[in-house]
Swiss-Prot record:
It comes from Pyrobaculum aerophilum (strain ATCC 51768 / DSM 7523 / JCM 9630 / CIP 104966 / NBRC 100827 / IM2). One of its GO terms (molecular function) is snoRNA binding. Coiled coil: none annotated. This is Ribosome biogenesis protein Nop10. The gene is nop10. Pfam families: Nop10p. Keywords: Ribonucleoprotein, Ribosome biogenesis, rRNA processing.
Amino acid sequence: MKSLLRRCVNCGEYTLSKDKCPRCGGAVRVPHPPKFSPEDKYQKYRILQKLLMGKLPIRDETKERLLRDLTS
C-alpha cells in the first residue's frame, strides 16, 4: 500500500496533496523510509550509486576496491 501522507520540504507541514504544499507551495515528499528487507535485492545498486555520487565517506583505495567488486 502506498503512503497517502506527504510532508513539505520547505515548511515541514504534513498534507495529503501529491503535487505541492497548500500552505507555502513547496515540493512535497513521502516522509516514511522504505520498508526494510533482510534479503535486499537492490543493495548493490544503492551502494554503487552512493559511491559514484560521492555520498559515502570512505578512503579512495576502499572506494576503488568496492567499485571493482560491485561492477564485476
